[in-house]
Amino acid sequence: MIFDDVLDLAKKVSKYTIAGEGNVSIRDGDTMLIKASGSTLETMTDEDLVRCNLDGNALDDEKKKPSMEVSFHAWILKSFPEIKCVCHTHPTNTNKILCSGDIIDFANKRLFPDQVVRNGIMSCVVPYA
């Protein structure tokens, strides 16, 4: 069942993230379940999921709120009906690069041919405040 697979995926990818950060969402018919704000990928269970419509609005009258990135997940699931789940993380090694003085050089390199196709010939870097 995709639901159990997504929870398993969340736990596995959490090992490569800062403090279990990131989000997962699962399509469920015309709605989605997304990780609740304040929950971690490492420890999440079905109790840490909030039901939302595909516009990103919470449907359950619960104390838990959906992740602040609910709009991003909702947009993907609404725009691409073939997608059943979305998982994104904040990987430790990627964050090391993003916080280093080498980010501009790294961002302007293209390591794989499909990066040019998907990302174009230039990168946009927004420095951390």
PLM feature spans:
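Glycine-rich flexible loops
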Residues: 1-129
